[in-house]
Structure formats: C-alpha cells, structure tokens
C-alpha cells in the first residue's frame, strides 16, 4: 500500500497524502504485531518510503499549485528535508531528523486543505511564510523531538495514556478498555 496510495496524490492530493501519512505512522506497528521480521533497519527503509511518497507530493506541487510563494516555500522545505534524510543516512544520528524536520508534508496538507475551500492564489507572501513557520515551530519540531530524540512511539502512547492499557495489549482489547474514548475519537 505504501507504493500504491502515493500514486493518487497528484489527482486527489488531500485524501491521498493523509492516507500515506497514516500508513507511514502505522506500518512499523503492523510489522511488529503481525510479522516476525527483523526491524533493525526499519528507520532506513521507512525514510526511503517517505521520500517516495513525498517525491510524488512534491511533483504534485508543480502540477496543482497556483501560488508562487507557496511553491517556492514547498521547494525549500522539500530540499531541506531531503538534505536531512541524506545526512541521517550517512551518519545514522537521529537528532539530524529533528534539525531537518519534515515540514514539507504538513505544509502540503495545509495547502491542499486550503485549496478545498479557497483560492490559494489569494494567500499573501506573509501568510504562506507564516503558515510554514507555524507548522515548523509548533507542530513539526515537537513531533520530531517526540519521535527522534525522545524515541516515543505514538501507538504505545495511545494504548497507555489514552486507552489505559499496556503497550503489548492488542488494539481490540485497548479499544474495548475505554469505549467512551473510542467513541470520542471516532466522533472527532
């Protein structure tokens, strides 16, 4: 699926990138739960698959976007992260991914969401840069710290802190442990 879903990004940018994002977030957990695969090199092939779907998203920027400033910001964010992934591959230091956050992905999502309701050509230079800065500072830096510095796992967090179970609890048991939380998450 991580090879197929991204192919829909140029035609259906928002739903396809969101599906790719969810698959990216869930694949390690799926592999851990349902296979006996050795996941020692997971970070490396995960980054390669990220580059694959984000490359398609980057190409979709040129195909679909109409705001020149947003295109230029997306280009910078894309290449900045690409340099970071390359440095990570060379040095195998997780902090590098914190310094070079994947702001491009969420910027793409924000632009695609804006595009569903408004004409993005109306976004000012200041608004585009402000949006990218907001995503970088308040969303991506904390998230990259959580993943690459603290090395926390989102699925473990959900099971322990949201559903009140242990990380090894099955998802079926975790969800049934707190049905009100499950209902609230679905309703949101």
PLM-predicted stretches and their roles:
Residues 56-121:
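Membrane-proximal helix-loop-helix units in multi-pass membrane proteins
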